[in-house]
């Protein structure tokens, strides 16, 4: 029984060494590929973006629709950079200044789930900075009453 355990332990140690060596080789290959990729990327000139970089948003309610359109357009043409909701929200946050930046700090401090949900983050911004999507619907209903 003890001999079997010793043999098993020896076999496991040998397997561990072999896997460690293989892992080291793979990590070296990965390092070389990352360096090669960086070198190739420096040689390639990225195409110019047809949509300008969005302006910052300071919390001024009248600018919120413009800010959302600018950022959405920019993210659409650069979709490879914004592959998930967390990246989109982080991009929006990077453009906030003043009152808007102060507004987002508590969400960051408590690591709110809203930071990983683009739609929810936009809805929260709209609610805070005074953009109501239902405004047009209410106007239509009032017109129907007359």
From Swiss-Prot:
Entry superkingdom: Eukaryota
Keyword Cell division: no
Keywords, ordered alphabetically: Nucleus
Subcellular localization(s) per the UniProt record: Nucleus
Record carries keyword Lipoprotein: no
Gene Ontology CC: nucleus
InterPro entries reported in the protein's UniProt record: DUF4939
Main location group: nucleus
GO terms, biological process: cellular response to lipopolysaccharide; cellular response to muramyl dipeptide
Family classification: Belongs to the LDOC1 family.
Main function: May have an important role in the development and/or progression of some cancers.
Quaternary data: Interacts with NOD2.
Protein name: Protein LDOC1
Gene: LDOC1
């Amino acid at each position: 029984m003890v001999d079997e355990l010793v043999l098993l332990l020896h076999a496991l140690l040998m397997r561990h060494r072999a896997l460690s060596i293989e892992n080291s080789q793979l990590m070296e290959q990965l390092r070389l590929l990352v360096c090669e990729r960086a070198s190739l990327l420096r040689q390639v000139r990225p195409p110019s973006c047809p949509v300008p970089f969005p302006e910052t948003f300071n919390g001024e309610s009248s600018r919120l629709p413009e800010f959302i359109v600018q950022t959405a357009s920019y993210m659409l043409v650069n979709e490879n950079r914004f592959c998930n909701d967390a990246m989109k929200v982080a991009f929006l946050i990077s453009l906030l200044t003043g009152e808007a930046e102060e507004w987002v700090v508590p969400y960051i401090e408590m690591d709110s789930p809203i930071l990983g949900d683009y739609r929810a983050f936009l809805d929260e911004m709209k609610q805070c900075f005074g953009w109501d999507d239902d405004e047009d619907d209410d106007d239509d209903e009032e017109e129907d009453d007359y």
